[in-house]
Amino acid sequence: MPTPVAAARQCLSPAAVPALDAAVASARRRAHAQTTSLHLISSLLAPPAPPLLRDALARARSAAYSPRVQLKALDLCFAVSLDRLPSVSASSSSGAADEPPVSNSLMAAIKRSQANQRRNPDTFHFYHQAATAQTPAAVKVELSHLVLAILDDPVVSRVFAEAGFRSGDIKLAILRPAPPMPLLGRLPTRTRPPPLFLCSFAAADDADVPSPAGNLAGAGEENCRRIAEILSRGRNPMLVGVGAASAADDFAAASPYRIIHVDPNTIDRSDLGVAAAMASATSGLIISIGDLKQLVPDEDAEAQENGRRVVAEVTRVLEAHSKVGRVWVMGWSATYETYLAFLSKFPLVDKDWDLQLLPITAVHAAPAAAGPAAAGGLMPPATTVAAFSKPAASLMDSFVPFGGFLCDNYEENSLTANSCPQALRCQQCNDKYEQEVATIISASGITAEDHHQGGLPSLLQNGSMMGPNNGFDPVKVRDDRMVLNSKILNLQKKWNEYCLRLHQDCQRINRDPYKPFPRYIGVPADKERSANPSKGSESIGVQKDVIKPCAVSAVHSSSTARPISSPSVTNKRNEDLVLNLQARHSKSDENLQERGMQSQHGTLSNADNPDDHASPSSAAPVETDLVLCTPRDCSSKGSSSTCSKRVEDSERSVHLVPKKVDDLNLKHPQLSVQPNSCSWSSINVGKTSHSTLHSVASGGFSAFGQWQKRSPLAAQNSDLSNYKLLVERLFKVVGRQEEAVSAICESIVRCRSTESRRGPSRNDIWLCFHGSDSMAKKRIAVALAELMHGSKENLIYLDLNLQDWDDSSFRGKTGIDCIVEQLSKKRRSVLFLDNIDRADCLVQDSLSDAIKSGRFQDMRGKVVDINDSIVVLSRSMIHGSKNGLEEGLSFSEEKILATRGHRLKILVEPGRAITSGCPSGKVVVSPRHFLTKIQASLCSGSISKRKLSMSDDQEKLQESPSSLKRLHRTSSIPFDLNLPVDEDEPFDADDDSSSHENSYGNTEKSIDALLHSVDGSINFKPFDFDKLADDMLQEFSNILRKNLGAECMLEIDVGAMEQILAAAWKSEDKGPVQTWLEQVFARSLDELKLKYKHVSSSTLRLVPCEDTLPTVKGDGLGVLLPPRIILDC
C-alpha cells in the first residue's frame, strides 16, 4: 500500500524534505503512479540538489572508464529507467492531493534509515528518551542515511551497475566524506578524530579536527583549498594554467608555512639544506621553484646547467627529509606544453618529487556555495530548500568543474585519508589491486590510434556519442591522460589500507615507497605456465616525447606479476574505521583459486585475465553477494592483445653506433660514459691489475625516460617490466651485445614480474656476466643504476682481482668490508663485482651467504640489507667454456686494456718497400720486437677481411716471463692470512703442487655453486677488435690519400695501433677518434709535406715513444691519444 507523501515527509529531516519534494515533482511531471527510489536518486543527481551524492560518485567511481563517458552513461541510465516506469492517464492522476504517493520500496528505505539512526552511538540516549512519545516522527531521517538505505534497493543498484558504479563504493564515499578542513600537518595520535561507524557519519562532518591551515579559510580562494588538499596528502602540487602564477602567489600569502623561492642563477645549497633541516621544528617548508619555463630554456647552455642544478638540489633535499614529511616543493607553468617539456628533460622528477598536476583554468576561482559554513570554499555547501529552486540541468554540468577537468580524486574513497608510512599488501590484495589497475588501463579509452569506446558496452558507447562531432575529442583525451596517474595512486593507497585493516595476520609483500608508477609485462616464469599467452591492453600514446604508459605484453606470460615499487606515501595516521560493503562476482574467487591467474601486464598495471571472467563493462545485471568487511573485486578481460617483439639478432656492431631495436616513437638522450674521465673516477679501464671502489658521478638528472613501477618492488608505479622499452634503452647505451642485453632485460623482467624464488620479501636481483667486453658490461651497469634507481651515483664498482690496494682509504679493509661500507650509504644501488672468479675465499663465502640471506656482513659484524638492489657478478670466462681468451684474433681485449697512452712519432724512410700485406696496400700494421708480429693490411681501393696468422715461433715468443707471471698472479688460489702457519712442516714440491690443485678445485666448485644461485647468467661475445682495426686503417688510408697522394705508404706500429683501438673502444662511438684523425694526424701530414719534399714517394712509420702521456683530468681521450704527433724527418 503506497504511503501518502505527507506521512513520509514527517519522517524526514528538514535537509531531506526538499529531496523528497523534488522526487515527487519529477514523478508528477512524468505522470507516474508512485514516487520511487529512482525518482529520489535522480533528483539528487541534478545540479540544484545538495552535492552529497554527486561528490560521493566523483570519489567512488570505479575508474574503469573515462569520467565524461561514465557520468554521461549514469545520466542516461536513470533517464531510461524512469522512462520504463508505467504512467497513468491524466484523469486518474488528477486528485485532491495531486502528488504521487511514496512507493513501498522507498518507504522501506526510510524505515531502515530510522532504525540506523536510532542505533547511532552519538544520539542513542536522545532517541531512547524520545521513544516514549511513540510517534513515527520521533526519528527524523537525515539525507545521508536515506541515501545509504536507498542504495540497498536492488533496482537502484542495478542502474548504478549499468553505468559502472558499485553501491558499496558509493556507500563508503558517503560514510567517509572529505575532511571539512585541509589537514596540512600530520595529526598526532592523541588529536585524531574518533573512529567512524556505519551509523555515526555525523561525527565526521562535525568533528573538531585541529589543523594548522585554519587561516586559509579567510583566503576565499578555491585554488588555495585545492593546493592545501594536495599538501595534506603528502604530494607536491604542480600548477598548470593561465592562472597558475596568481594562484601560487595567493597561496603563498595565506600559507602558514615558510616558503623559499629558488632562483636557478643564485641557488644556495647550504641555505636550502639548513631551511629544510629546520622544517621539522616549524610548521613546514615549501620550496617554490617558480615558473618551469626558466628550468627548461631553449638553447642557453648555462641556463640549462642551472636548471639541472636546481632539480638535483631539490631532489636531494626531498630525499633527505622524506621521513620528516614537512618539506614540499611547488612550481607552476602557464602552459601544459612547458610542463611536458619539463618532464621530458627531467623524467624522474615525477616519481622523485611525487608530483600531482593541478589545473588552474581561471585567475581567480568562483566563490563557494553560499552559507556561513562554506566560507572560503573550505566547507561543503549547506543543504537548503533553496538548493532545489533552480531548474534541473544535465548531470554532466555538475561533474566537470574547471573547464572539464575532473579534479576529485578516488583517494577519498579509501579507508583513511592517507596511506600508511610503508605500503604493505598481502598477495591476495595485491592481485585484486592489479585487477583494478588493469581495468583502468584497458578501458580508459585515451589512445588516439584506436576508438576510445572500443571496450565499452553499447550503453556507454551511446553516451560517449553525445560528445562534440559525435567522435574523438582530443581535449577529453588530454584531460583523461592527466588524471590517469592520480587514479592509479589512489587505487594503490586504497588496497594498502584495506589490507592493513583486514588482513593483519597475512604475510605481506614489502613495497618500497619511493618507486614510480607500476609497469607490468608478462614473461616466462616457469615451464608449466609458459604455454598460456596473456592478453595485453591497448597502448597509451606518447605525447610530446614524454614517456607515457605504454602497454606491452609478452608472448609467454605466467603467474601474476609482482609490482616493483610503490610511490611515496604519507605518515598520517588512519582516521576512521568503516564498514566496507562491496559487491563482488560470485564466481571470481573460485576461478582464482582453482587455476593460475594469467597476467596481463601494461606499463602502468598488472591484472589477471581468466578467460571465463565476466567483464565489468557488461551492461547486464550481475548476481552479487554483500560481504561484510571483505574487499572484493572482479577480474577483467583485456580489450585487445599486443605481443611484445623480441630483439632480432643483428650484425655485431663495430662502429659502436646503437641500432634500432623496434620503433616505439621514443626519443631518449644518449648516456655519456667516459671511462677515463672524472665521472668514472674509480674505474680506470686501462688498468686490469688495479681498481677501486667508486660511485659514478651524476649530473643530477636522468638521461632516460621516467621508469615507472611498483609493487612488491614497485610497480606501484608498475612492474618495471616493459621488456621492449627496457631493451631499447639499454641497447641505446651499449650499442652492441644484442643477445646479452635481451637476456639481461628478460631476467630483470622475470624477477620483477614473478615472486622471487628466495621468498616474497626478497626484491634483490643477482646477475652474472660471463665473457669479455668489459666496457659493455660497465656501460650496462651504469644504465641499470640510472634506470632502476634514478641516478648513475647508485652504481658501486669493485674489482676483486686486487693483490694490493694502494689507496689509503682501502688500507686494512677486505673486499667485503668495502662492499658493506658502500651499501650502507646506498641501500638501493647496482653492485658491480668484477673478476669474481679471482676473489679470495672470504669474499666468495660472503657472497654465497648474501644470496641466501639477502644481506652482507663484514668482518666487524656489521650487517647491511641488499633488498631492492641489483648485484652483478662479472668474470672473463664464458659460461660453459674452460677459458675466456679470444682465439684467432690479432688484437685481444687483454692487450687493449693493458695499453697506456704514449706520445706518437712519424718517421720518414725514403724508398723503403713494404713486404707484408696485399701488393697494393698503402697502410699496414708493422710488427714490433717484443710483441707478436701481427701484420694487417688494407687496400686503398676496397676493404677485405684480413686473415691473420701466427707462426709457431711467434707463439713461443709470446710466452714471455711477464705474461706467465701475470697469469700466475691472477689465478684463483685461496690464501687466507687468518690461518696459522706450520713452520716445522718440511717443504715438499709434490705435496705443495697437490694442495695447490686441491685448493684450486675447491675454489672452482665454490664459484660454480655461487654462480648457479644467481637469477640470470649472461654471456658476452668478445669484441671484434680486428674489424675495428680494419675500419681505422681505412680512415688512415683516406686521410693519407687526401693529403699526400696515392703513392705514399704508411706503416703503423702495433703499439700505436693498440693505442688507437683502445681510444675507439673506450669511447661511445668513433667520433672522438675520427676528430683526432682529421685534426691531429691530418695536420701532422700537412706539416710533414712542407718540411719534406719527397714525402709523397716515401714510406711513413707511426710509432709510439717510450715516454707516456701526462694524466689528464676531465672528459676526453687525452690519456690515450696525444694532442700533437712528433715529426722526425
Swiss-Prot record:
Biased composition (Basic and acidic residues): 645-654
Domain Clp R: start-end pairs: 8-180
Polar residues bias (residue ranges): 596-608
Acidic residues bias: start-end ranges: 981-992
Record has Signal as a keyword: no
UniProt motif (EAR 1) ranges: 577-581
Entry superkingdom: Eukaryota
Residue span of region Repeat 2: 102-180
Keyword tags: Repeat, Ubl conjugation
PROSITE patterns listed in its UniProt record: CLP_R (PS51903)
Motif, EAR 2: chain positions: 798-802
Annotated spans, Repeat 1: 12-85
UniProt short sequence motif EAR 3, positions renumbered to this chain: 975-980
UniProt region (Disordered), positions on chain: 519-573, 587-654, 975-1001
InterPro entries reported in the protein's UniProt record: Clp_N_dom_sf, Clp_R_dom, P-loop_NTPase, SL_signaling_regulator
Composition bias type Low complexity, residue spans: 557-568
PTM: Polyubiquitinated. Strigolactone, but not karrikin, triggers rapid SCF(D3)-dependent degradation via the proteasome.
A Pfam family reported for this protein in Swiss-Prot or TrEMBL: Clp_N
Free-text note on domains in this protein's UniProt record: Contains 3 EAR motifs associated with active repression of several target genes.
Job description of the protein: Repressor of strigolactones (SL) signaling. Subjected to a negative feedback control of SL signaling.
Sequence similarity: Belongs to the ClpA/ClpB family.
Name of the protein described by the UniProt record: Protein DWARF 53-LIKE
UniProt lineage: Eukaryota, Viridiplantae, Streptophyta, Embryophyta, Tracheophyta
